[in-house]
Amino acid sequence: MALLLIIPISLVTLWLGYTLYQRLRFKLPPGPRPWPVVGNLYDIKPVRFRCFAEWAQSYGPIISVWFGSTLNVIVSNSELAKEVLKEHDQLLADRHRSRSAAKFSRDGKDLIWADYGPHYVKVRKVCTLELFSPKRLEALRPIREDEVTSMVDSVYNHCTSTENLGKGILLRKHLGVVAFNNITRLAFGKRFVNSEGVMDEQGVEFKAIVENGLKLGASLAMAEHIPWLRWMFPLEEGAFAKHGARRDRLTRAIMAEHTEARKKSGGAKQHFVDALLTLQDKYDLSEDTIIGLLWDMITAGMDTTAISVEWAMAELIRNPRVQQKVQEELDRVIGLERVMTEADFSNLPYLQCVTKEAMRLHPPTPLMLPHRANANVKVGGYDIPKGSNVHVNVWAVARDPAVWKDPLEFRPERFLEEDVDMKGHDFRLLPFGSGRRVCPGAQLGINLAASMLGHLLHHFCWTPPEGMKPEEIDMGENPGLVTYMRTPIQAVVSPRLPSHLYKRVPAEI
């Protein structure tokens, strides 16, 4: 019995000693008082970015939050974001990898979970110069327009069917199919879901792999922050090995199909898998890196665009004035006898402002993935010890009344008054990050979101379900790394163009 008491007392004593040492040696940012062992884990509310923003109101724009024994520093304004992402970028460019992230990424052999160093620089160069180059994005544009027009076709068929006339439509389902098919076609050259919504055999396996990966990662969540608890939550080596083998088996099969197709045709297509296989020797890319990069694209692109568009549509239904103004611009530029293409974007400034304003108020990833300090560094006059994690609260930065007029108001006109970049150059608006770890696919995400919004608004009018006022729409968020609406948006849809403009425009590339 005495031994059972000694162990937890010793652990608590060690933790208190370590915390005291950190506080005496370093001038740490202020924050809520941590509890022994667990730190602030039990004080954090489910929607973390809102919780951290509330704490910033009490303690200031830079705060310390302890996840168990790990110091996490949260910054919540644009000046501090600039320090983290520009002035001290290289010192804060490493990545904290949980045990599950380490397994999924083969210890950082991909891009997202790689530490800053020669490997990261190499694979980022591949992404920037090869995978997401303007030339490749333009070559793959027909895929995006195919999937967006397929969505329009699907929404039209749903809302004009006899049994659905006048009823609300659950938009998330249609947005999710676009995002899913778009990213799998870009990455793998595969459309796993057909026009009837039926998923093929490889698609079923792909979806199962994604869901199993999420399940495995979630099973270790608490133990990641409290190392001495890991004996209670052991890493299931067998389960992770089985998952990795399953993922690799599917990916290798797709890679083999593309290799064989290149041999027969004598040339490569523009899909990411073809590009990586073609560039393998030039950049000395291992198979682990190719597989890791492909799954990075899937992970980063499968949900985020659909989430952004759902939030934007919710705001447009709540703000009919803005919806009407976008439609007037679309009618003026495109008319009522053709459909929009990405070539029209430059003539649709208000649509682009709506896209920006939605991403300002509702960034799909409201907390940046943590940047790990690879050396001791000062931010905002406080010490950030080596090994600490630094998070930028993108959501709080974009709602800061010190830099935004009426920050809680959905007002796209603000971007007509001042052109604000959202690809990492203006630290007030950071939906895609900034600095060495800025998202290389930012332009792809912007183009797809603007295309989806433009088509939905050009083809249809959107109103709340019968009996609901616009202001009654639930604008709360679900907890999680990405921010779904707590209540999926439902709306009554009315077509506004001639019926022949609601057909899918297929692209076989």
From Swiss-Prot:
Keyword terms, alphabetized: Heme, Iron, Membrane, Metal-binding, Monooxygenase, Oxidoreductase, Transmembrane, Transmembrane helix
- Keyword Iron attached: yes
Q: Which domain of life is it from?
A: Eukaryota
Q: Which annotated residues bind heme?
A: 439
Major location (coarse): membrane
InterPro entries associated with the record: Cyt_P450 (IPR001128), Cyt_P450_CS (IPR017972), Cyt_P450_E_grp-I (IPR002401), Cyt_P450_sf (IPR036396)
Which Gene3D superfamilies does this entry report, sorted A to Z? Cytochrome P450
What cofactors does the UniProt entry give for this protein? heme
**From which residue to which does the signal peptide run?**
none
Report a single Gene Ontology molecular function.
iron ion binding
Q: Where are the transmembrane segments?
A: 2-21
How would you describe this protein's topology in the membrane?
Single-pass membrane protein
Pfam families xref list = p450
Among the entry's GO cellular component annotations, what is one? membrane
Which cell locations does it reside in?
Membrane
Annotated EC: 1.14.-.-
| Major enzyme class | oxidoreductase
Asked if the keyword Metal-binding belongs to this entry, the reply reads yes
* Stated family: Belongs to the cytochrome P450 family.
Kindly provide the name given to this protein in its UniProt entry. Answer: Cytochrome P450 98A2
Cite the source lineage.
Eukaryota, Viridiplantae, Streptophyta, Embryophyta, Tracheophyta
Gene it is expressed from: CYP98A2
